[in-house]
Amino acid sequence: MARLFGTDGVRGVANRDLTAELALALGSAAARRLSTITTATATDSAERARRVAVVGRDPRASGEMLEAAVIAGLTSEGVDALRVGVLPTPAVAYLTSAYDADFGVMISASHNPMPDNGIKIFGPGGHKLDDATEDRIEELVHAGAVARPTGTGIGRVLDAEDALDRYLRHAGKAVTTRLDGLTVVVDCAHGAAWAAAPRAYRAAGANVIAINAEPTGLNINDNCGSTHMDVVRAAVVEHGADLGLAHDGDADRCLAVDATGHVVDGDAIMVILALAMQEAGELAANTLVATVMSNLGLHLAMRAAGIDVRTTSVGDRYVLEELRSGEFSLGGEQSGHIVMPSFGTTGDGIVTGLRLMSRMAQTGSSLAELADAMHSLPQVLINVAVADKTTVAQAPSVRSAVAAAEAELGDTGRILLRPSGTEQVVRVMVEAADEDTARQVAARVAESVSLQG
């Protein structure tokens, strides 16, 4: 049986893979595993210490169904559900800590298309769960029904009316220099950032032009947001803005565009923030944490600045693990997941946007000038849809194609092939001295993957 949890929670097509029944079972299992008191002590006493779980979601249509199912699972185990509504994933993580909840649940499929949805669980303090805890929850999902509380022991559903304001006050602490005079276009992806991001940036003083900020439940990530940067690029040029920011469906990512429409990806953002934090004496151990997907240009820029780079597997959970184990202060991914542990336990697109604009305001430099600290090697990424991503990635013919590509590139580039943690695809990434070489090498390797798929 395939593992229920992927690299970022449980995901699938809503009502087919991720059903209401599964959502209820996950809510129930999480309550049993993560609550701090047992069901046996929580059956009849109205004076008992209530266990609490924060529950949030993005605006996709299936979120309402899955939210109701998760809450049913929680309350059936005697856990109160503190419903915070449509909020970014990092807000739910923060509020899990701020409300001193036992755990938190975010219902979102992030950058995935509208038919998909997902369930992500945060432990105490808003931290992502480790593999062992996820495995135990999965065991409980498959274990079936158990004796449950009755009467006053059943959990209640509460609404946190101050949730958004509380998160915005927290995010605002990331502002080191007021943003007065800066004009920013923000693409909210018709997602969880639709209200939070424009408010956060305006509160910091920026002139904000919000686009794709009218969620219907059906239009999340639909040709917009951080996976469709051409939209914000065009808007920045049209409005003559200083920069553009693009979030994904749950706003844990942030990518940027300079005034000319040039994309500033997560690698470049990390370089900008690392240099700023080094200057301020805030870069712990003079170290940045990045993943194997980060461009070689990031490593060269950090080496020139005397900053060490710790490299992890792909996925912000692995970045988080390295940040926590090494007590580092900055890490992230090329995709725009940027983590600053002093501000949160997970990637926060809005905090990233505020920090990036603060650096612009502090230095008086344009985003293009700041991004010039890093020069990326041409990078080509091809996603190949396959039936069994793990088997295909390990096929002898595919490994042979990768070895041949590595021999061809030598010291002038690199290749990375890996199964996606969230989609049924194998990702082929190639960096080379010139784009033509990168494309040709990537195409050959992708063809070998496709033939196996």
Swiss-Prot record:
Keyword Metal-binding carried by entry: yes
Classification via Gene3D superfamilies: Alpha-D-Glucose-1,6-Bisphosphate, subunit A, domain 3, Alpha-D-phosphohexomutase, C-terminal domain
Functional note: Catalyzes the conversion of glucosamine-6-phosphate to glucosamine-1-phosphate.
A GO-annotated cellular component: cytosol
PROSITE patterns per UniProt: PGM_PMM
Domain of life of the organism encoding this protein: Bacteria
Similarity comment: family membership: Belongs to the phosphohexose mutase family.
UniProt modification remark: Activated by phosphorylation.
Catalyses which reaction(s): alpha-D-glucosamine 1-phosphate = D-glucosamine 6-phosphate
Chain positions with Phosphoserine modification: S110
Free-text comment on the cofactor: Binds 1 Mg(2+) ion per subunit.
Species this chain originates from: Mycolicibacterium smegmatis (strain ATCC 700084 / mc(2)155)
GO biological process: carbohydrate metabolic process; peptidoglycan biosynthetic process; UDP-N-acetylglucosamine biosynthetic process
The encoding gene: glmM
Entry protein name: Phosphoglucosamine mutase
Active site positions: S110 (phosphoserine intermediate)
InterPro entries: A-D-PHexomutase_a/b/a-I, A-D-PHexomutase_a/b/a-I/II/III, A-D-PHexomutase_a/b/a-II, A-D-PHexomutase_a/b/a-III, A-D-PHexomutase_C, A-D-PHexomutase_C_sf, A-D-PHexomutase_CS, Alpha-D-phosphohexomutase_SF
